[in-house]
Amino acid sequence: MDKNMLGDLDNLPEEDKLKMASMIEQLQIRDSLRMYNNLVERCFTDCVDSFRRKTLDKQEETCVKRCAEKFLKHSMRVGLRFAELNQGAATTD
């Protein structure tokens, strides 16, 4: 987002600012839930082979833990990279 656009948001009426904040919050919640669901589906599919017991065995538990850690590290790295690209794009405007 460029600085002119942010300046325009500051000029909005208070009611519109509240609506924008609410929309942004809803989008953040949606994205968080989507990421969580993707993580659960991917790690469960990759790590759990059968339903032998109610609980995960040690191997499945270790696999799920590693999978989740990898997924979160990757997601954080992608987010940082997008932030770097956005910051670079904003400075070239």
Curated annotation (Swiss-Prot):
Membrane topology per the record?
Answer: Peripheral membrane protein
Give any GO molecular function from the UniProt entry: metal ion binding
Classification via SUPFAM superfamilies: Tim10-like
Residue positions of motif Twin CX3C motif: 43-67
GO BP, one example? protein transport
Where is the protein found, in the record's own terms?
Mitochondrion inner membrane
- GO cellular component terms? mitochondrial inner membrane
Disulfide bond recorded as keyword: yes
Q: What keywords were assigned to this record?
A: Chaperone, Disulfide bond, Membrane, Metal-binding, Mitochondrion, Mitochondrion inner membrane, Protein transport, Translocation, Transport, Zinc
List cystine links.
C43-C67, C47-C63
Assembly description? Heterohexamer; composed of 3 copies of TIM9 and 3 copies of TIM10, named soluble 70 kDa complex. The complex associates with the TIM22 component of the TIM22 complex. Interacts with multi-pass transmembrane proteins in transit.
Role: Mitochondrial intermembrane chaperone that participates in the import and insertion of multi-pass transmembrane proteins into the mitochondrial inner membrane. May also be required for the transfer of beta-barrel precursors from the TOM complex to the sorting and assembly machinery (SAM complex) of the outer membrane. Acts as a chaperone-like protein that protects the hydrophobic precursors from aggregation and guide them through the mitochondrial intermembrane space.
Q: Please report which protein family the annotation says this sequence is part of.
A: Belongs to the small Tim family.
PANTHER family, from UniProt?
MITOCHONDRIAL IMPORT INNER MEMBRANE TRANSLOCASE SUBUNIT TIM9B
- Domain commentary: The twin CX3C motif contains 4 conserved Cys residues that form 2 disulfide bonds in the mitochondrial intermembrane space. However, during the transit of TIM9 from cytoplasm into mitochondrion, the Cys residues probably coordinate zinc, thereby preventing folding and allowing its transfer across mitochondrial outer membrane.
Task: State what protein this is by name.
Answer: Mitochondrial import inner membrane translocase subunit Tim9
Species, as recorded: Mesembryanthemum crystallinum
Taxonomy of origin reads:
Eukaryota, Viridiplantae, Streptophyta, Embryophyta, Tracheophyta
